[in-house]
Amino acid sequence: MEKFTDLNYTLSVITLMNSTLHTILEDPGMAYFPYIAYVLTVLFTLHKASIPTMKIALKTSKCSYKVVKYCIVTIFNTLLKLAGYKEQITTKDEIEKQMDRVVKEMRRQLEMIDRLTTREIEQVELLKRIHDKLVMQSTGEIDMTKEINQKNMKTLEEWESGRNPYEPKEVTAAM
């Protein structure tokens, strides 16, 4: 029976609010009512959501100052978003985190540029060596002894013992 009474009470409160809203909205002087209701709803929601959150955070956190600061910054950022601003309030910790992230990214970019520069220098040196090998140098007379394989040929007089080492020798076998 108690639950039924609570349900009737809730329904009567909703009916009362609806009738009140209809009478207010019929009045032409209340053109800004939806905006006022919107702001009040947001403030009420923030109030109801932030107080228990702050209590839990303060009990469980070791550093209550940072928690309070973070909650206040979050509330103000929410209000700024609701007002249509794109800017946000940031704490020093967030700024330091963002700066560290930017510095890390810059270091990574510099390392990549250094690696690419080193590779490009190596490629240029390799291309220079290839070019130097491909460049034809003009010579007055071409030595053809290399081409016909006669550079190291010796005549009979030039051999040390005076006989041709490539000539077959007589071999006798014992029977």
UniProtKB/Swiss-Prot annotation:
Matches recorded under InterPro entries: Rotavirus_NSP4
Disulfide bonds: none
GO biological process per UniProt: monoatomic ion transmembrane transport; symbiont-mediated activation of host autophagy; viral process
Location within or outside the cell: Host rough endoplasmic reticulum membrane; Host membrane, Host caveola; Secreted
Domain notes: Binds 1 calcium ion per tetramer.
Residues passing through the membrane, by range: 29-51
Main location: host cell
Binding site for Ca(2+): E120, Q123
Post-translational modification: The N-glycosyl content is primarily Man(9)GlcNAc, with a small amount of Man(8)GlcNAc.
Keywords, in A-Z order: Activation of host autophagy by virus, Calcium, Enterotoxin, Glycoprotein, Host endoplasmic reticulum, Host membrane, Host-virus interaction, Ion channel, Ion transport, Membrane, Metal-binding, Secreted, Signal-anchor, Toxin, Transmembrane, Transmembrane helix, Transport, Viral ion channel, Virulence
Name the UniProt record assigns to this protein: Non-structural glycoprotein 4
Lumenal domain ranges by topology: 1-28
Keyword 4Fe-4S attributed: no
Organism superkingdom: Viruses
Cytoplasmic side: 52-175
The keyword Transmembrane helix is annotated on this UniProt entry: yes
Subunit organization: Homotetramer. Interacts with the immature particle in the viroplasm. Interacts with host CAV1, early and late in infection. Interacts with host integrin ITGA1/ITGB1 heterodimer. Interacts with host integrin ITGA2/ITGB1 heterodimer. Interaction with microtubules blocks trafficking to the Golgi apparatus.
MF GO annotations: channel activity; metal ion binding; toxin activity
Organism for this UniProt entry: Rotavirus A (isolate RVA/Cow/India/Hg18/2000/G15P[21]) (RV-A)
Bilayer topology annotation: Single-pass type III membrane protein
Residues with attached carbohydrate: N8, N18
Recorded family membership: Belongs to the rotavirus NSP4 family.
Any single GO CC term annotated in Swiss-Prot or TrEMBL for this entry: host caveola
Role according to the record: Plays an essential role in the virus replication cycle by acting as a viroporin. Creates a pore in the host endoplasmic reticulum and as a consequence releases Ca(2+) in the cytoplasm of infected cell. In turn, high levels of cytoplasmic calcium trigger membrane trafficking and transport of viral ER-associated proteins to viroplasms, sites of viral genome replication and immature particle assembly.
